[in-house]
Amino acid sequence: MQPVVETLSGLERRVDLAVSVAEVEKEVQAQLKRVGRTAKVAGFRPGKAPLAMLERSHGPGIRYDVINSLVGRAFEQAVDGAKLRVAGSPTLTPKTEGVADDTLAFTATFEVYPEVTVPDLSALAVTRYDTPVTDAEVNQTLDVLRKQRAKFETREGRASQDGDRVVLDFAGTIDGVPFEGGKAEDFPFVLGQGRMLPEFEEAALGLKAGESKVFPLKFPDDYQGKEVAGKTAEFTITVKEVAEGVLPEVDAEFAKSLGQAEGDVEKLKADIRTNIEREVKARLQGRTKGSVMDALVEAGKFDVPKALVDSDVEGRIAAAREELKQRGVPNADSVPMPAEVFSTESERRVRLGLLVSELVKQAQLQAKPEQVRARIEEFAQNYEQPAQVVSYYLADRQRRAEIEAIVLEDNVVAHVLENAKVADEKVPFDQLMGMA
């Protein structure tokens, strides 16, 4: 008789399972005999130990495994018969009341996958982003590269300006008391690079070698040094050297320093444009994909299995702890990480994953081999030996799978853009690149 699966609430289900004690014991005895052929028991030759002795030493473990196996088989038969897709693992509870002596009974509580309905794509409003790359962006990048290669020349009597390197001594106190990290001598930094807090840079601006200044500085509330975060310090700085940054000319020598073997400035600019366009394309794709996925998940109204959300939370906590370990954070395994901090995003990820999976199936958006190869070849252009990178990915199934997942998402985004209400929006270059 097929067990009856009961709906509790939402995606939660319950089913009663039973296995015969006789069937359990039959399998236990069979496994004990198999173990007995090779088991080493003190006082007996291998394979000659009495079955009763094997029962005492191996019986409990074997019986536990047999019951788990038989109950698991009964559970699979029950859900297969009911044509259910189980999300996560069932929770098994032994039953004793009203159960015959020759039967072991359990109640399995579990969740099922929801019926996922892909929303009407024509009703979705999404944004497709664009950023044109012009000569201005190429020249801007050239300026950044020149500044990175600036040579600093000491200027006597020069008042410091943005782009100058200053060398100074500083000492800070909070309520008249020095604090750790608040003092240094011969400390160099370049004004305008944002390495120091804005108030510190502003205080150093306009000073000449030999000049000093006393000023207050309030540390941000989220400052990395927790002992001074949110507090106001008094700093004294004394400038010892001001050096002007002299930028290199954009010439053959400069081009060669950036890897343009021929020293051809125009080819260098073309290479820079290609690199910018590649980076811009990747960032625009990310923004547009975010808009598409946000629209999908917002329109996807269905319950998600708690088991899948919990599993995602556990995975993200484990990844966060591993990242802390890599950064050398002590006691990374015991740092408090409440599950509720991750649960909202995990629920979104699970919902989106179910939606994307259903959309891929309905619209046949699976990644094609030629798409995967093209994406690998595009990705490989970021490296000095593109052919080796292509071979590296094609030779390993797991690495190819990573690219396949990216291509699949690209296919989903393209499909939604073809069918949704699309608003085009231009993003300023500086904003896109995080420079604004």
Curated annotation (Swiss-Prot):
Keywords: Cell cycle, Cell division, Chaperone, Cytoplasm, Isomerase, Rotamase
Annotated InterPro entries: PPIase_dom_sf, PPIase_FKBP_dom, Trig_fac, Trigger_fac_C, Trigger_fac_C_sf, Trigger_fac_ribosome-bd_bac, Trigger_fac_ribosome-bd_sf, Trigger_fact/SurA_dom_sf
EC id: 5.2.1.8
Residue span, PPIase FKBP-type domain: 163-248
Coiled coil: none
Gene Ontology biological-process entries: 'de novo' cotranslational protein folding; cell division; chaperone-mediated protein folding; protein transport; protein unfolding
SUPFAM superfamilies (UniProt xref): FKBP-like, Triger factor/SurA peptide-binding domain-like, Trigger factor ribosome-binding domain
GO MF annotation terms: peptidyl-prolyl cis-trans isomerase activity; protein folding chaperone; ribosome binding
Superkingdom assignment: Bacteria
Subcellular location(s) per record: Cytoplasm
Catalyzed reactions per annotation: [protein]-peptidylproline (omega=180) = [protein]-peptidylproline (omega=0)
Cellular component annotations (GO), alphabetically ordered: cytoplasm
Function: Involved in protein export. Acts as a chaperone by maintaining the newly synthesized protein in an open conformation. Functions as a peptidyl-prolyl cis-trans isomerase.
Family matches, as NCBIfam families: tig
PANTHER family named among the record's database cross-references: TRIGGER FACTOR CHAPERONE AND PEPTIDYL-PROLYL CIS/TRANS ISOMERASE, TRIGGER FACTOR-LIKE PROTEIN TIG, CHLOROPLASTIC
Domain notes: Consists of 3 domains; the N-terminus binds the ribosome, the middle domain has PPIase activity, while the C-terminus has intrinsic chaperone activity on its own.
Family statement: Belongs to the FKBP-type PPIase family. Tig subfamily.
Listed name of the protein: Trigger factor
Gene source species: Bordetella bronchiseptica (strain ATCC BAA-588 / NCTC 13252 / RB50) (Alcaligenes bronchisepticus)
